[in-house]
Structure formats: C-alpha cells, structure tokens
C-alpha cells in the first residue's frame, strides 16, 4: 500500500493559508496577539519540539535541509522527485529504535569515524541517523543521549547530517533565539557540535503530523 504524499508549501513565501497553518502548529490559537502572557506561553512552547525537513540524496541517504522550533515535533521527508510526507509517530520510534541498536553495537554511522566511510555510494546517513543528528533527535532520542554526548565522532558527524553549513548555522541560530535567556541553557556550547552536545530540551513531546514546511 502506497503511503500518501503531500506537497508542503513554503510558508515563508506563500501567505494566507500557509501562515495560518504555521500559527496552528506553534500552538497560538488565540487572535489576541497583544497579550504578554500569551506571547510568553508561545515562547515556551516552541522549545518543546522541532520541525525538521529531511531530503533524500542520490545515494539514498538523507540530509537535514531545514529545521526550527515548533510546539510539537514534525519530521518531513522529501524524496528525489520533491514529494513530501510527514513521518508518523510509529515510523519515527521504529527508526530511532533501529538506530539505537546500531549505536550499541558500534555500526551506526553517527559514532563511526568520518561518517563510517569515504565518499563511496551508500556512505551517507539513513533516516534513523539523520533524525538523531537533527534537533528532533535531541528531543525524541533524549533517552539515548548519554550514549552519544561524549562521543567525538558523533560531535563531528551530527554536523554532516545537514545539507550545507548554512543549513546547520540556521538551525543553531533558530534554536538559540528561542531558548530562555534566564536559564543560561539556551545556547549551544561553542566547544561542542551536534544537538546532544548542546543544551537542547530533553523532554519528549508527542509527535504530530504537520502539513507545512518550506524549501531550503
């Protein structure tokens, strides 16, 4: 049975309905934008999840092309033809469990030197490792964070899960801006890269199927 694919509009470019969908996903259901308490609540909610877009590569691996804070965690997969779909909670948990087993036995490319190989075909990251290398991995896979936190190979490989240095930097900036300044835990450590090596939230919010995103 074929899984349904949905084209996800660029909310940053397309106005109207896309903007309304964005508002609903970050949990701002009120039209009273001038209330300080509501703004404070919104600021806190975006730290609970991440919206991540993974793009399939020619070698069938996956790269993070965009991610930013969201009230709930959404993972969108874009195939080579540009079709996009949102992974279900069950799919995500299955992928994380499979990758955890690889981490335990040392076969995960996240913990191998130089991404587990050179530039040969198939040396890229699969869906599970791409998820755990993203911001969503720090949230959904927080329970295995200790297995990765001090791993120097992970610290390097997590950056390689991004399609470009610019995509990685945009993510860092986006999550740093959304972090609470008073806690002293809002920005990633300059000495570490990757999301298990930063001060990302470690709560595990429910995964929700979203219907919007934007092209990198």
From Swiss-Prot:
<feature type="compositionally biased region" description="Low complexity">
    <location>
        <begin position="198"/>
        <end position="209"/>
    </location>
</feature>
<keyword id="KW-0564">Palmitate</keyword>
<keyword id="KW-0449">Lipoprotein</keyword>
<feature type="compositionally biased region" description="Polar residues">
    <location>
        <begin position="159"/>
        <end position="196"/>
    </location>
</feature>
<keyword id="KW-0732">Signal</keyword>
<feature type="lipid moiety-binding region" description="N-palmitoyl cysteine">
    <location>
        <position position="28"/>
    </location>
</feature>
<feature type="signal peptide">
    <location>
        <begin position="1"/>
        <end position="27"/>
    </location>
</feature>
<feature type="lipid moiety-binding region" description="S-diacylglycerol cysteine">
    <location>
        <position position="28"/>
    </location>
</feature>
<keyword id="KW-0472">Membrane</keyword>
<keyword id="KW-1003">Cell membrane</keyword>
<dbReference type="GO" id="GO:0005886">
    <property type="term" value="C:plasma membrane"/>
</dbReference>
<protein>
    <recommendedName>
        <fullName>UPF0323 lipoprotein HPAG1_0235</fullName>
    </recommendedName>
</protein>
<comment type="similarity">
    <text>Belongs to the UPF0323 family.</text>
</comment>
<dbReference type="InterPro" id="IPR020913">
    <property type="entry name" value="UPF0323"/>
</dbReference>
<feature type="region of interest" description="Disordered">
    <location>
        <begin position="159"/>
        <end position="216"/>
    </location>
</feature>
């Amino acid at each position: 049975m074929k899984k349904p694919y949905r084209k996800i509009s660029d909310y940053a470019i397309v106005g109207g309905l896309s903007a309304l969908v964005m508002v609903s996903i970050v949990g701002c259901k009120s039209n009273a934008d001038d209330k300080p308490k509501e703004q404070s609540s919104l600021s806190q909610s975006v730290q609970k999840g991440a919206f991540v877009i993974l793009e399939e590569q020619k070698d069938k691996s996956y790269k993070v092309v965009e991610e930013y804070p969201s009230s709930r965690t959404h993972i969108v997969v874009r195939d080579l033809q540009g079709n996009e779909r949102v992974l279900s909670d069950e799919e995500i948990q299955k992928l994380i469990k499979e990758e955890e087993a690889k981490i335990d036995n040392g076969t995960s490319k996240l913990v191998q030197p130089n991404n587990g190989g050179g530039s040969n075909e198939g040396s890229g990251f699969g869906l599970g490792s791409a998820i755990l290398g993203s911001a969503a991995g720090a949230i959904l896979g927080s329970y295995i964070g200790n297995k990765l936190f001090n791993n120097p190979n992970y610290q390097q490989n997590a950056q390689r899960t991004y399609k470009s240095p610019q995509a990685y930097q945009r993510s860092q900036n986006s999550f740093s801006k959304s972090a609470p300044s008073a806690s002293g835990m809002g920005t990633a450590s300059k000495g570490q890269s990757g999301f298990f090596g930063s001060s990302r939230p470690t709560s595990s919010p429910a995964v929700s199927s979203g219907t919007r995103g934007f092209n990198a």
